[in-house]
């Protein structure tokens, strides 16, 4: 049976337009978009007063499966993604065992095949993410990997990374770098600056990120490979990516919601849910990130969804793991803090969360609301205001930095290939 979504404020991202339209879906495909469509032989869903947007695509999630399923697993992570309005995610490889061979990719594929979510897979750059010996990229690509990364670790050996980039270029594989020079980061836990001094915590200098980005871009220039810079957090990093783009290099970059809306001042209370890597930076760095986003230097907003069990986070700040739970609150955080405050338009925000990640990951018929595209869609209620609580979150872990915050503009329905995969039930959570 088909589906007709009526009276939605449809955001056509690439056109930069919001129009009140009806959308007809048949066999998982958008077959018609028109001001008025009337059909009695399909399921009709009236979304008067709400936005219909392309399903969000997150290029950076950690589902912790296999190896750390007390934090998250593919099913719970997928539930969190769908609740957040996402219809596509790219899984990172810091699992145990890691996907440095086809076996883990096949495990992921088998476990995710019945889930109504486009789950994409990354393979490791090096065996065991140890930075020494290359994984078999061809085998990983044949198994289904769309990118390679040692995320969580930077490939510090320049010769190894050069060979990886040459190998990836030959296979047209995207390389995602985690830019942090470890000897400069030197076991820091927050941004090096005023707040690290006040709080008595070891700082992570911005130079650790900047030096890694500089080296990786230089190797991208040597090899012609596609390089994606994960979780930018510094003004200098933005400048380096901008310079690479001006040279015509195949370099793209992402930023997280938390780096766009929070600064290191938020750590004054030693909240371990705000302990992330890269760390939250000063307001000046945050302004540069937003400027880079608006100017097109930063292509993508990605959550870096990194769940941890409560007992792992409820320890001394130095001992707590890095990472936050980010999928479920990403859109309302950005809508509340950026769109409603007129720092970015809804259309431009969605460009970074739908069209651009679809292009970078080479996902055909995804990322926008167009005739012939897959019916991967999200309904947003722009007036729905909810207080973030542990009870509201559906993922396994609750390490969300926005707990207690009141946010507006929540996903209320997620449609994957013409099937309602998630619907928000509001009773008892407002």
From Swiss-Prot:
Coiled coil regions in record: none
Entry's cofactor comment: Binds 2 Zn(2+) ions per subunit.
UniProt cofactor(s): Zn(2+)
Top-level class of the enzyme under EC nomenclature: hydrolase
UniProt record, GO biological process: 'de novo' UMP biosynthetic process; purine nucleobase catabolic process
Binding-site residues, substrate: 62-64, 94, 277, 308, 322-323
Binding sites annotated in the UniProt record for Zn(2+) 1: 60, 62, 151, 304
One GO location term (cellular component): cytoplasm
EC number: 3.5.2.3
Catalyzed reactions: (S)-dihydroorotate + H2O = N-carbamoyl-L-aspartate + H(+)
Annotated GO MF terms: allantoinase activity; dihydroorotase activity; zinc ion binding
UniProt-listed Gene3D superfamilies: Metal-dependent hydrolases, Urease, subunit C, domain 1
Binding of Zn(2+) 2, residues: 151, 178, 231
Similarity-based family: Belongs to the metallo-dependent hydrolases superfamily. DHOase family. Class I DHOase subfamily.
Function summary: Catalyzes the reversible cyclization of carbamoyl aspartate to dihydroorotate.
Name of the protein described by the UniProt record: Dihydroorotase
Lineage, opening ranks: Bacteria, Bacillati, Bacillota, Clostridia, Thermoanaerobacterales
Gene name linked to the record: pyrC
């Amino acid at each position: 049976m088909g589906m007709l979504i009526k009276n939605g404020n449809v955001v056509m991202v690439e056109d930069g337009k919001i129009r009140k339209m009806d959308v007809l879906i048949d066999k998982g495909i958008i077959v018609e978009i028109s001001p008025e469509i009337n059909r009695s032989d399909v399921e009709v869903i009236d979304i008067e007063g709400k936005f219909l947007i392309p399903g969000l695509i997150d290029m950076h999630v950690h589902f912790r499966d296999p190896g750390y399923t007390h934090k998250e697993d593919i099913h719970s992570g997928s539930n969190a993604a769908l609740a957040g309005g996402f219809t596509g995610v790219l899984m990172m490889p810091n699992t145990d065992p890691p996907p440095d061979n086809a076996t883990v990719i096949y495990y992921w594929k088998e476990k995710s095949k019945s889930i109504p979510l486009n789950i994409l897979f990354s393979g490791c750059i090096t065996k065991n993410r140890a930075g020494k010996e290359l994984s078999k990229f061809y085998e990983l690509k044949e198994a289904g990997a769309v990118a390679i990364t040692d995320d969580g670790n930077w490939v510090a050996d320049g010769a190894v990374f050069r060979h990886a980039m040459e190998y990836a270029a030959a296979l047209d594989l995207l390389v995602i770098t985690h830019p942090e020079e470890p000897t400069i980061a030197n076991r820091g836990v927050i941004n090096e600056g005023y707040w690290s001094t006040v709080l008595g915590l070891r700082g992570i200098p911005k130079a650790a990120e900047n030096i890694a980005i500089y080296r990786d871009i230089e190797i991208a220039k040597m090899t012609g490979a596609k390089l994606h810079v994960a979780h930018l957090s510094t003004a200098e990093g933005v400048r380096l990516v901008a310079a690479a783009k001006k040279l015509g290099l195949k370099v793209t970059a992402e930023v997280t919601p938390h780096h766009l809306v929070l600064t290191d001042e938020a750590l004054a209370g030693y909240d371990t849910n705000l302990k992330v890597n890269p760390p939250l930076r000063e307001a000046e760095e945050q302004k540069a990130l937003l400027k880079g986003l608006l100017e097109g230097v930063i292509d993508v907003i990605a959550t870096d969804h990194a769940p941890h069990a409560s007992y792992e986070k409820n320890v001394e700040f130095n001992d707590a793991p890095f990472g936050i739970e980010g999928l479920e609150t990403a859109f309302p955080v950005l809508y509340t803090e950026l769109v409603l405050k007129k720092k970015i338009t809804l259309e431009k925000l969605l460009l970074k969360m739908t069209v651009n990640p679809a292009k970078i990951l080479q996902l055909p018929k995804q990322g926008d609301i167009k005739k012939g595209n897959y019916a991967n869609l999200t309904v947003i209620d722009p007036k729905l205001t909810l207080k973030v609580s542990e009870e509201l979150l559906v993922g396994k872990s609750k390490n969300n930095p926005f707990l207690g915050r009141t946010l507006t503009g929540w996903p209320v329905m997620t449609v994957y290939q013409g099937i309602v995969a998630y619907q928000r039930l509001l009773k008892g959570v407002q």
